[in-house]
């Protein structure tokens, strides 16, 4: 299982550090929870008038006391144990702040066929039932689906230590646990290529590769590493948070505020202040606010160009190099 070795509560460090966090999206709020649990003074600055970042929501009031809420970003939730670990580390329980429902079926796929009605697949964590639906499309696909799940269980298990720590230098990539991943990553193959190892029917491949679009990528271009995405759905399920995914942001914000975190919405950070190469605070509405440390939870390229002076960046992070890069879009779905 990719769960971490421990979910014990973070012990207060006794530190009197003062930390600014740029952005009240899920990463910023998670950072705030963990830092506050260790005893650090935390202030979160969010440019928008509401929390959530790309997991914010739109509210349409229809009459007094009644309104409709629409998630602006994700609409379903994966791997809830990760958020459970964050809450546990802060000495709290996710179930005290949010209500999650496991979906079964997870979603319905309509697989189009020229001149025919689409094939309907109701995806489920019941591997035998899911395999039977795939067998109806391609003989033997059920057994291959079970092999696909087993292989990706090994892949994610080996990759988890790597995914849970920063890669700061080349030697991090040749550490023992990183090298254990090398034989199973197949970096020269795409998600679509790797599915060809298991299935022949293009509709079965579509059913298990469209998840790469969550990353804004085509299955034909997406690195084969990301076959873990459909595996994660079938292994851990798809969940609906009552109130939408933004309700999870509210849950995290509530936990933060209980621990003394200050969350300032409508407070766009214009730039980070520096003394030499050390961040010393943030500039908001023309005011420089001192902090000992700054955590940035914003798009990396945007933050580099807008928050950090070019003179302090590495050459590969110059404005010209950042402008020359290709960036994937997110997925727009109705």
Question: What kind of feature is each model-predicted range?
Answer:
Residues 112-223:
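Rossmann-like flavin
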Residues 12-158:
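N-terminal glycine-rich phosphate/pyrophosphate-binding loop and immediately adjacent elements
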Residues 238-251, 255-259, 272-273, 287-334:
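Glycine-rich loop(s) and the adjacent beta-strand/alpha-helix scaffold that form part
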Residues 179-193, 234-254, 264-266:
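Short beta-strand to alpha-helix junction loop
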Residues 265-279:
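A conserved short coil-to-beta-strand element within the FAD-binding core of flavoproteins
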Residues 222-233:
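Residues forming anionic-ligand binding surfaces in small-molecule and nucleic-acid pockets
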Residues 1-12:
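N-terminal mitochondrial targeting presequences
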